[in-house]
Amino acid sequence: IADIASPKELTDEDVLWISGPDYLKCLDNYDVVFKSPGIVLERPIEEYKCRILSQTQVFVECFREQIIGITGTKGKSTVTTLVYHLLKESGMDALLVGNIGIPAFDHIEEITPNTKIVFELSCHQLEYMSVSPHIGVLLNLHEEHLDHYGTMEKYVAAKYHIFSNQKPDDIFICSTQCLPPRGICPSHIMEASFREESEEDFDSGMRKGQGIQVICGEDRAAVNF
């Protein structure tokens, strides 16, 4: 275990503790390193000899096709909870996990092939991800965590991992206010808007300016499972 803080007491003799200000310099001594969200690496991840993973990365690798990943600067806990309850009330086997305060691996035994996993993802969880969920949702982008990222561009780049490693048959649902530049999203983009100045509908069937009716305002479902 590498940590900048010094452990007050070592209760497990089988654990090697590496502490102090240079604790990150030991990473290349290992084949695989699990990184906690929010830790800033000293150099780009591709420059390390070891493979740097996280619990989120491994979980998404294992259950990618079943995951609805939701991120955004504001409102992601509310929307994640809403989506979970919509799925549950419709009779689906749904699981709520992630940055909302529910560690994903604590509920792994509950997952079946039919489980829909609603996963709240923070920028710190997404920052070094090399895999994206089957369905990714980006609600909004505002200036935040710039003490960690330094620039808005780096913060946005972390959020974009919600879709950047998707496949062509995956789905990316995004607010019109934070659509990525044309050509960088490999999956099918479905736009949604909460603005009221337009009454037009999207080709996807989702309606502009209707808030919750973006999902419930049409005769057909916006996304089928």
Model feature map: region roles:
Residues A2, G20, Q55, I173-S175, ...:
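Generic beta-sheet signal
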Residues T11-E13, E47-L53, S198-E200:
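ANL superfamily adenylate-forming
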Residues I1-L10:
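NAD(P)-binding Rossmann-fold cofactor-contacting core
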Residues Y149-V156, S187-F225:
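Adenine nucleotide phosphate-binding catalytic loops in nucleotide-utilizing enzymes
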Residues E9-D14, D106-E110:
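Active-site-proximal loop->helix
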Residues D12-C26:
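Glycine-rich, highly charged phosphate/nucleotide-binding loops
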Residues A2, V32-F34:
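A noncatalytic interaction/capping subdomain that flanks phosphate/NTP-handling catalytic cores
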Residues L24-Y30, P37-H188:
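Phosphate-binding loop of NTP-binding sites
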